[in-house]
């Protein structure tokens, strides 16, 4: 099932599930879908560079998120450089854009990683992680809480300093009304499984868009969607879409059983 405008493919699911690979390939080959390949760091899947390169060769996505390490600026930058060299050696750099997700334990570290990403001409897209941004920008961090507040603070800071210079993709979401705030043309796109997760708990955004049920890290592999009212999923996606000034919306509905 596909409810978004393009496909956000998770590399660990590509490796694990043949039916997932079939669905993603059909969206690419039959429908010409724009595909972002995620490295699955947020899912703690520990996908290696070798695996990510192999998936790139099989899928040939439009863009791939370079391997990042949660909250670690130095390792994330080092991984991105190493990944770029590997992409060059595999002759993939001229076919697949590289997407960089800044990391850092502090706001200062995160900003250093972000500005480093701006300075690399081979980095085409930058991600605002639902995990990394709240961790760096808020005084206290709680999993999947205050995502909107943290990203608004980050956005305001960057906008005021003319640092929104490359397309931004918001990785995941909290309160879906977050996206109505963005008016800068570099705010490109978002993805989230939350409209599906919320519907599975009978949460309709039109009634309650503030409560954020934390997403289990293995949610996409293990949750049984057979009893979920898909009209509620569609209503939540519509609510989210109506908040978006950004160009593209991804809903990880491709992970619902086919």
Feature locations, PLM:
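Non-catalytic, usually N-terminal nucleic-acid engagement modules in DNA/RNA processing proteins
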Residues: 1-92, 253-258
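Alpha/beta catalytic cores of nucleotide-metabolism and tRNA/nucleoside-modifying enzymes
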Residues: 53, 119, 152-169, 175-258
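Eukaryote-skewed repeat-based solenoidal scaffolds used as protein-protein interaction platforms
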Residues: 56-190, 195
């Amino acid at each position: 099932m596909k409810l978004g405008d393009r496909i956000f493919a998770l590399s660990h699911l590509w490796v694990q599930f043949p039916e997932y690979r079939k669905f993603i390939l059909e969206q690419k080959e039959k429908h010409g879908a724009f595909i972002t390949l995620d490295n699955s760091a947020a899912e703690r899947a520990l996908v290696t560079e070798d695996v990510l390169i192999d998936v790139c060769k099989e899928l040939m996505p439009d863009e791939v998120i370079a391997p990042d390490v949660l909250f670690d600026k130095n390792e994330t930058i080092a991984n991105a450089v190493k990944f770029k060299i590997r992409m060059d050696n595999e002759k993939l750099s001229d076919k697949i854009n590289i997407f960089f997700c800044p990391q850092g334990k502090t706001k200062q570290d995160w900003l250093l990683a972000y500005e480093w990403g701006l300075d690399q001409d081979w980095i085409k897209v930058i991600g605002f992680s639902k995990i990394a941004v709240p961790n760096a920008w808020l005084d206290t961090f709680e999993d999947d809480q205050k995502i909107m507040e943290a990203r608004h603070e980050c956005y305001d800071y960057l906008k005021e300093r003319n640092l929104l210079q490359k397309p931004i993709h918001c990785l995941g979401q909290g309160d879906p009304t977050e996206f109505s705030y963005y008016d800068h043309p570099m705010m490109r796109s978002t993805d989230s499984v939350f409209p599906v997760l919320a519907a599975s708990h009978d949460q309709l955004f039109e009634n309650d868009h503030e409560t954020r049920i934390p997403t289990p890290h293995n949610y996409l592999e293990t949750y049984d969607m057979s009893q979920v009212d898909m009209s509620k999923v569609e209503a939540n996606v519509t609510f989210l879409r109506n908040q978006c000034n950004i160009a593209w919306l991804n809903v990880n509905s491709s992970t619902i059983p086919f």
